[in-house]
Structures are given as structure tokens and as C-alpha cells.
């Protein structure tokens, strides 16, 4: 009986492993309605896309079927090989979209700039047997590309989707998964991987993440904390002057880290010609300028008893709070552009909410202390005045 139970358990585990493995290989289980067969397939990492292909090294022919699933109406799709680079410019694309009359149009379009309109033209290599089907929200592009084996059999690939205006493709989104849809494909081994650029093989996505983390931590978290320190710790006489040095340290550190993040953003902008995030960029420049003015204005800070100190305080508080508001807005704008997993936005939102609650509680406590201290000082002054007059309060 025990042997039978163990055998059943082993059989169940075996079936589970086989089933899990089969489910994990999404593209290998797909059956084309045209009964076409391909030797290899890759589950592309973004945009719900899959590439099925067969490569004949003797003829240099690459037979492909590019599938784009979960496609909403009014969308175009494209798959491309870039023989000269790793991005969009220089890509030799195959485009397809459903037309208003119900037919599907498939054609070739070389990409020469980021302002492309996806106009039809011949590619730098021969393409034959080009066709496409669209049903059940899935577009499939079929083609044979003549690609003589080069660079060890590794090719750079790009795939995209975007909206249509009538029968005209509109520019695709320039954030989220639409800027991650690049990969390399080894036609010999079948291996695929992310495309790397820049020194040390750091990808643009990694640089975007570094840019986001540096700016989120500095402008978006440390700056508000520094303001909270200055606003609420100085109410305690025992914290003077420690609160000031802590405030300066926090804000200075935030500024230094923020400048590093800002410089990373400038570098990303230079490496991504044609991709513009105008609002995000403008707010970032405004942040840098205001924060820099704030730093250098510290050298012009009048002494507490100086007659112009009140005006300096008004300026300092106005610029400081403006920086914090712009920083939080721009961090959320950056999250919209980067489109990370939802947990990152939730985490930053939670941090801002907690800081907001802390500020509200401390604001109430500060006013309580200030009012109580004011009453005590007023009472002390009254007692002193009465004492000086030689009269009792009880007379």
C-alpha cells in the first residue's frame, strides 16, 4: 500500500512538472491556423508578443511569424531587424494593421529617424511572401527575410505597437514597455537577450532606473524630510542649533544626489534623440535652478537680528516649498514615463502620505507648543510688570 502511495505521489509530481514546463513555454505550444511549422520560437519580454522562426544558414533565409496578442482595435504592430544599431533608427521594419474595410495591410518600412510616419518602402534586404492575419485580437505577420549569416549569427530586433488614425499609423508611446521592446536574437543557438548600450554594457533601461532612484530619493524624499526637520525641530529650544546642522546636511545631501540624477537625465536625453518628455524635462531644469539658487543663497543669509532677515526667510521658505512641490510632481511624472511595477508607485505614494501625516501632526503640536509658550511668556511679563509696580495681582 505504501509503495502504491509513493508511486502515485511520484507520478503526480512528474505530471505537475511536465505540465508546468509546458505551460511556461507559451510559444512552443501554439498551433497556427495555417498549419505552418517553425523550428524555434521566443516569448518576447514585453508587449504580449512572440516570434516563431526558422533560419536556413545555407540560403540566409529567415522565415518568421511574429505574433502580437491582446491587440485592441485601431492599433498597428511592427517587427524589425536593425542591421546597424540596437534601437529604432536604422531598423528595417515589417508593419501590419487592420484597415477600415476589414482587410489587413502588411508592408515594409525602413526607419530613418524618430519622426517616422512608417511610410512604405523597400528594406535593405529582400523580403518575400509577406502577409498578415488579424483575428481574435491577435495579429500575425508572416515573411521570409534574406539575412546572410553575420556577426556570429546575432541580429538586433525591435517590435512595436501604436494607434491608428484612420488607416495611418501614429507615433508609438515613448514610455513603459514601448521603450523596452528591443532584443538580440542568435539565429544559430536560438538564444535571445536584452540589448545593451553604453560603457560597461549598461542598458538604457538600467540608466533610466538609476535616474529614477537618484531623483526619487533625493528630490522626492530627502528634500521633504529636510524641510520637516527645519520646520518642526526648531520649536524645541533644546534642539538648537542641532536642528539647523541636520537640516543643512539633509538638504545638501539631497542636492548632491539630485544633481547626479539630473545629470543622468541629461545624458539619457542626449542618447535618445527624438524622444522628448517636455514637461518632465522642464520641471527637472526648474528644480535644478531653484535648488542651486537656494544653496548659494545660504551664503547671503542675514543674521537673525538683521532688518532684512524677515525678507530672506520669506524667500527661503517660498523657494524651498516650491522645490518640494515640483519634486513630488516630477517624481510621479517620472513613474508614469518609466512605468515600473505598480509596487514602486505604491511605495512612493505611501512614503509621501506618511510624510504628509507626520507634517500635519507636527504642525498641530508646534502650534500647541508655540501658543502655550506665548501664554506663559505673556503671564511672566504681566507678573514682572505688576511686581515692578509694587502691586499684588490679588488686590
Swiss-Prot record:
Classification via InterPro entries: AIR12_DOMON (IPR045265), Cyt_b561/ferric_Rdtase_TM (IPR006593), DOMON_domain (IPR005018), UCP037471 (IPR017214)
Main location as per UniProt: membrane
Membrane topology: Multi-pass membrane protein
Domain (DOMON) ranges: 47-162
Entry's free-text remark on domains: DOMON domain could bind catecholamines and thereby could regulate the cytochrome b561 domain function. DOMON domain could bind one heme b.
Subcellular location: Membrane
Regions crossing the membrane: 210-230, 242-262, 282-302, 318-338, 351-371
Domain Cytochrome b561, residue spans: 176-371
GO cellular component: membrane
Gene3D superfamilies: 1.20.120.1770
Function per UniProt: May act as a catecholamine-responsive trans-membrane electron transporter.
Cofactor notes: Binds 2 heme b groups non-covalently.
Species this protein is from: Arabidopsis thaliana (Mouse-ear cress)
Obligatory cofactor(s): heme b
GO molecular function (one): metal ion binding
Binding site for heme b 2: 247, 316
Keyword tags: Electron transport, Heme, Iron, Membrane, Metal-binding, Signal, Transmembrane, Transmembrane helix, Transport
Entry annotated with the keyword Disulfide bond: no
Designated name of the protein: Cytochrome b561 and DOMON domain-containing protein At5g47530
Binding site for heme b 1: 211, 280
Residues in the signal sequence: 1-24
Record has rRNA processing as a keyword: no
